[in-house]
Amino acid sequence: ADITKLRKMTGAGMMDCKNALTESEGDFDKAVEIIRKKGQAVAAKRSDRETSEGCVLAKSTGDYAAMIALKCETDFVAKNADFVALTQAILDAAIANKCQTIDEIKALPMGSGTIADAIVERSGITGEKTELDGFNFVSGPCTAVYNHMNKNQLCTIVAFNKVCDEKIAHEICMQIAAMNPIAIDEAGVPEAVKQEEINVAIEKTKAEQVQKAVEAALKKAGINPAHVDSEEHMESNMAKGWITAEDVVKAKEIKTTVAAEKAANLPQAMIENIAKGRLGKFLKEVCLLNQESIMDPKKTVAEVLKAADAELTVADFKRFTLRAE
């Protein structure tokens, strides 16, 4: 009976509970402490290990939604029913208390200790480093969540400015999961990100303009640009008889002189206009409201929301995944 009670309280395996009760000479409280210390020892020993697997869950209670990730080392542990149940219990506690930080969650009571203790105990049971991560929350008049394919790997949570149709809310959650926007609209994209995109676009446009000029000059000289686009190609194409050594010398001279001349005389206004166009394309891809709807590609997300309710918009969203993208 004590073994069953100890298993229920700690989640430890039958043999661990039996050994703890034997070691404590039947003292139940001491047995609980033994299991807890074992968990702490395992956790400390594996503190430098990488936790690339885990379980991610999200839940909404009307005006508040949250997500949490309980991370571990292997897929085998992540899929274990007890591990998933612990993740769900932690999320339920966070939801019930409308937590705003991960430290708040760790301090909440669970079992005979706190959630932080429960995580350490789970580490002792599985023998793997276990940690809490990925906590995010949103709040508003209406919230929705999406657990991607119920595989506990990717979740999204969304808050709307007013109560909205459940189907629309679900579609927006799926949109965020699929298209991974970084902001609701352009105003939410940091200026540093925009400037970096402009800088990259300018350099890319300059390089393209220089390349066009070089290719035009090579063609005018009777040389196929594809035959001289690298040292390796020049050597192999000479061996094949497609170009001569004189062609190579001429091509190298053209590439050097034309590239330098074009780079020194690039039309700045044109370059900036092209770069701005590329920034616009980037913002369309990364801003949620600007994106094409995955459910109706002829419309943007903003248009889908407006069609449902002229005043409806997204107030906040969060996305978390265990997988590299």
Feature roles, as predicted:
Residues 1-325:
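N-terminal assembly/interaction segments in proteins that build large macromolecular machines
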